[in-house]
């Protein structure tokens, strides 16, 4: 397995951190965007969006960081990062979607729109802080959402 990554971004870093923390058998290839490695025909066949990360597992290519985390956690249940029951899995999915669609979009926009986004920032971090109250991790136990 091989991960094509661009380390400076949060979505790439979280996948790299998961792989490194659990010492998973995944080769990490740091992308060179200056030389437009992500625009080659070969890369665009793996990810038509031309973005990173991408996980290549044999002839299977997977892009989107949360999908990659879920795939790796499913392949490696010994990590204990993905619950086996439907409710636990749905709860992980909820927090992964929330992170991707709400929290990350706010963080990305902070530099340009901090003042206008303060209400959204307060709301979303309030949700996160309330969920973390009295616990170390979002779901209580460490999982892929953390």
Located regions from the model:
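GST-like domain detector, emphasizing the conserved glutathione-binding G-site
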Residues: 1-123, 129
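GST superfamily/GST-like fold recognition
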Residues: 107, 137-146
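Hydrophobic alpha-helical bundle segments that form small-molecule/ligand-binding pockets
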Residues: 125-139
């Amino acid at each position: 397995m091989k991960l094509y990554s661009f380390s400076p971004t949060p979505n790439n870093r979280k996948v790299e951190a998961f792989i490194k923390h659990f010492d998973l058998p995944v080769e990490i290839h740091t992308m060179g965007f200056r030389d437009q490695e992500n625009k080659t025909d070969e890369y665009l066949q793996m990810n038509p969006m031309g973005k990173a990360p991408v996980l290549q597992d044999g002839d299977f290519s997977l892009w989107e960081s949360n999908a990659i985390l879920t795939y790796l956690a499913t392949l490696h249940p010994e990590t204990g990062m993905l619950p086996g029951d439907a409710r636990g899995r749905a709860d992980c999915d909820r927090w992964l979607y929330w992170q991707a669609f709400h929290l990350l979009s706010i963080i990305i926009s902070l530099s340009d729109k901090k003042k206008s986004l303060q209400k959204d920032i307060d709301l979303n971090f309030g949700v996160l802080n309330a969920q973390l109250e009295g616990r170390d991790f979002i779901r209580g136990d460490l999982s892929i959402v953390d």
